[in-house]
Amino acid sequence: MLGLFRKRNIAAGDMLFGEYIALGSILRAEGMNDIERTKAIVKTLHNKDMSDTIALLLIPYGLQVAEGYVAWKEKENQECYVPPRPEATQAGIDQRAKEVGDMATVVQFAERFGRTFEQVYNMPYLEVFAIWKVDAATARYQRRLDAVLKSKKDK
C-alpha cells in the first residue's frame, strides 16, 4: 500500500490535504504503532528534513502520530520542543494564554471549537497547536476548492 505513495515521489508540500488522511488511514489499518507510523510517513514523503510542523499536520484525525513523533525524536536523543505544562495557578493560566497567543485567542479558540477556557487550558500544547494548524489547512483547502468550482461555473 505504501508503494502507491512512494511511486508518486511527492513532497510534503505538494500533498493534498485529503492525501494526509488517506496515508494516515492506510498506516493505521496496517496496525503500525505511533512511532512506526511516523517513521513510515517520513520515509514515504522522501523528506528527511521534515519540520515539526509538517509532522504534526500529517494526520488530522488525531494526535497519536504527533505524540509518536515526539517519542521517536526523544528516543533518538534529538531535540523536539514540547512546552512544559504550567502550574494550575493564575500565573500558570496567564502563561498558558501567552503560549497559545493571548487571552482573546484562547477565548476565540474555545468558542470556535466548543470548549471552555478551562478545557483549553488543560489541553496538551501539541493538541492546541495541531487543532489550530489542521483547521487552518482545512480552510485553505476549502478556499482553493471553492475557487476552482467558481472558475468552472463562470466559464
What is each stretch, according to the model?
Residues 1-155:
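An amphipathic, hydrophobic-aromatic interaction surface with interspersed Lys/Arg
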